Amino acid sequence: MALLIAGPTASGKSALALRLAETCNGVVINTDSMQLYRDLHVLTARPTQEEEHQAPHVLFGSVDGRINYSVALWLDQARIALDEAQGQGRMPIFVGGTGLYFKALTQGLSDIPSVPDSIRADLRRHAEGCSTPELHRELAARDPEMAARLKPNDSQRILRALEVFVATGQSLAAFQNARSAPLLTMSEVLAVFLAPDRADLNRRIDRRFDTMLEQGALQEVERLGARGLDPSLPVMRAHGVPHLLRALRGEISLAEAADRGKLDTRHYAKRQFTFARHQLPDFAWRTPEEAETFFLSKLQRM
């Protein structure tokens, strides 16, 4: 048995996971692609040292920012964390905002081959001179099945599909259709997607961004920028990072950077709702206030 807590950013997932871990002798397992990176503690709202002392937390801040981490790498680490928790007689509690990680955990993972760096670099240079609709038309000419699955403005996924096709000569769809066995089936978990009121969530997002700035997010981003990492790396594209780097370079004001960071985060939260609705159909939607009662009542009946 394991507990799964998904949900949009700033919805109270981490606090709920900590309360459940204290109640159920649990281990909190990070299921958020940005909280993996040790470079961004404040800006990703990772658990504090005090919170980590209250209950075991694993896979938080465990990856260097220069690593282009993948869902496959996370799944390997999640398997180890799950085995260790169960071996210790503890309740595994997976918590985070990365829907793709939860999908891989409960539905299996497509075995997509890695793309050589040379091909990735060539295609990214090519993409710089093209609009996203043009890239989508190019994908449609090469891989019509995958192009039909993607929106014409989804630049990141279009480029990924092109990379796989150029590297393998096969459609990304073919790899996606062949999935490995899931690490946990839905019959082995209690899974919730936290669904707070949207207006309240937006206010929480804005307040939290201001709080993170007060707690040193700008200085954290300055240290990250000083590393000279490739701007295409995931850690360099975390919400708020590009705008705060521009503020540090004097290109925009800090106030404008904060406003843009908040807007990006609100848009991301909207996408998290959409992903869960379509890709995590078996997760129970509950408000943050309802979720703890849901878990505890279910556990008491088992």
From Swiss-Prot:
Its cofactor is Mg(2+). InterPro entries: Dimethylallyltransferase (IPR039657), IPT (IPR018022), P-loop_NTPase (IPR027417). One of its GO terms (molecular function) is ATP binding. It catalyses: adenosine(37) in tRNA + dimethylallyl diphosphate = N(6)-dimethylallyladenosine(37) in tRNA + diphosphate. It is an enzyme of class 2 (transferase). Its EC number is 2.5.1.75. Substrate binds at residues 9-14. Belongs to the IPP transferase family. This is tRNA dimethylallyltransferase. It comes from Beijerinckia indica subsp. indica (strain ATCC 9039 / DSM 1715 / NCIMB 8712). The gene is miaA.
